[in-house]
């Protein structure tokens, strides 16, 4: 199970790193009215590169963890709401794909709410487009999961618990080694 957490961390860092570097560069070298565009572009490139890697014949991941890394830099205020919705959805449905799509949507809605009237100002248009486009793209990448959910065949998350000593004794007594 810890491998999954490790991969999640690496994918998040894959999005966080270029976005963070672009944010630092932009804040030091670009006019305030265009500082957000470079980190948004870097984040989009990281997400698209994860979803459609050339070296894997354009067959990559769904982009959720990479988007998380990008969002931590671009819109940290929206991460909490998306994360809570992710956890609640997994707890209620045991479906990570559904939780990922809901969290992406909650991020977009939360970020647009946070931007408010500023969402249409030129310096925030790239962030507005990101808040709308990335959740749509993440949902698009989950098409096969959506089809399985509709058929009732989407796998649920299960807890893997190490067998207790009493389970081992029961197995030995029943002859199921």
Residue ranges and their predicted role:
Residues 20-41, 72-79, 113-129:
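Helix-coil boundary and interhelical linker segments in multi-pass alpha-helical membrane proteins
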Residues 17, 24, 39-59, 64-73, ...:
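Anionic-ligand binding patches
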Residues 1-16, 51-65, 91-102, 141-177:
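Interhelical loop and helix-boundary elements at the membrane-water interface
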Residues 7, 43-50, 86-90, 107, ...:
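Alpha-helical transmembrane segments of multi-pass membrane proteins
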